[in-house]
């Protein structure tokens, strides 16, 4: 199903390129265990939508919401006179997120990991090269919802754990970097942890009696 979800994302991006639409929103939500969801939204003006519908001879199901695989949600959203097609794809770990990212040309992952109680996000996006999927955009918004409080970042905007970058179009390679805390909520200490402590105490007690 992961391949199907990737195809859905690529179809949305391909439609954007064909229609001449220049707006993209990417939002990645990462949980403390590395799972999460990736949202990619493509915005079409009323004129762009009309032209695309004429090309495809399809005035209904503009975002193809009925063709999404079970693990992918496709949402059609109206914002004033713009139509946004948004894909929501879950991922079970950071390796799956890496695979989703790498389906697009023009993105390089430097670091994407949870280690030593910290989440590190370091990604380059190419907004200039002709071979990059991101070079056609006049508006690009990239957001990451961190698993914990931000420690260090180079984002343009911060709202609690949500970081947002607004790269200048055709400005070259943009580095998106952030580091955050990772809550320990993913590990349930009792009763398992308490049991381990109990076993350790018993071993220590009997060890002293010898």
Set out the residue ranges of the language-model regions.
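Intrinsically disordered, low-complexity linkers and stems that provide flexible hinges
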Residues: 108-184
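Solvent-exposed coil/turn segments that connect beta secondary-structure elements
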Residues: 33-35, 43-45, 92, 145-149
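Bacterial N-terminal signal peptides that target proteins for export
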Residues: 1-9
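C-terminal cell-surface addressing/anchoring modules of secreted/extracellular proteins
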Residues: 183-200
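One face of beta-strands
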Residues: 24-42, 117-123
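Structured domain cores in non-transmembrane regions
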Residues: 43-114
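C-terminal motif of bacterial Sec signal peptides marking the signal peptidase cleavage site
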Residues: 18-20
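C-terminal membrane-anchoring or membrane-association module
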Residues: 198-210
